[in-house]
Swiss-Prot record:
Transmembrane segments: none annotated. O2 binds at H60. This is Hemoglobin subunit alpha-1. GO terms for cellular component: blood microparticle; haptoglobin-hemoglobin complex; hemoglobin complex. Heme b binds at H89. The modification N-acetylserine is found at S2. The gene is hba1. This fish has two hemoglobins: Hb1 (major) and Hb2. Hb1 has low oxygen affinity, it displays a pronounced Bohr effect, which is enhanced by ATP, and a pronounced Root effect. Residues 2-143 form the Globin domain. It comes from Liparis tunicatus. Gene3D superfamilies: Globins. Involved in oxygen transport from gills to the various peripheral tissues. Red blood cells. The keyword DNA-binding does not apply.
Amino acid sequence: MSLSTKDKETVKDLWGHISASADAIGADALGRLLVVYPQTKIYFLHWPDLSPNSPSVKNHGKNIMSGIALAVTKIDDLKSGLNALSEQHAFQLRVDPANFKLLSHCILVVLAIRFPHEFTPEAHVAMDKFFCGVSLALAEKYR
């Protein structure tokens, strides 16, 4: 699914609202992921606490949103812009790429809750397409 110029503008505009609370959004989304899709906990068994508000979840949520921030800056070429993250997730972390879509869904839910006025149907479509592109770019090295 390709992003139109309008989609890219919408993503960047919404990111302007998101960026101030990106760490908390990432933590909330990751916490949701671990509760709603408990099979994803397998990647984090080395953490002492997998509860939604644990320091480990908060820290990794921050890392996730740093990756999303990078993707926003590389929105015109997600594949090459996220190449290093794709390699890390494929070869080092060995994350099943299906989990990228699950996390994307959790992020969308958090955005809808936190930004009810800004998260219009048009913004929802643009962000969904953006996260599909991010998921595809992150899965690139799995092929």
